[in-house]
Amino acid sequence: MGKPQALKDRLFGAAVLKMSFRLRGDEQSPAFKGIYPGVLRDLELEDEAVEKYIQENRAAVEAAARGKPPV
């Protein structure tokens, strides 16, 4: 088993995944609906916490979702 991730790292990963779908307008897609709940479960996160993280760190999350270096 790998090293446990810090909460901020788990939030960042889930936020980037969600933002990548959001930027394409695919949050209602079967792919997102199939993947995202499992990611939340595996990372022991709630969607509300991910949304809060996105609001507080939007620039960095969007940059990562677009495959660009962190802001």
Regions found by a protein language model. Name each.
Residues 48-71:
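Glycine- and charge-rich intrinsically disordered segments
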Residues 7-10, 38-41, 53:
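Short, low-complexity, polar/charged sequence segments that are solvent-exposed and flexible
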Residues 1-32:
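Extended serine/threonine-enriched, polar tracts that run as long, contiguous segments within proteins
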Residues 23-25, 42, 59, 67:
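Positively charged, low-complexity intrinsically disordered regions
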Residues 25-46:
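Domain-exit/linker segments immediately C-terminal to small folded modules
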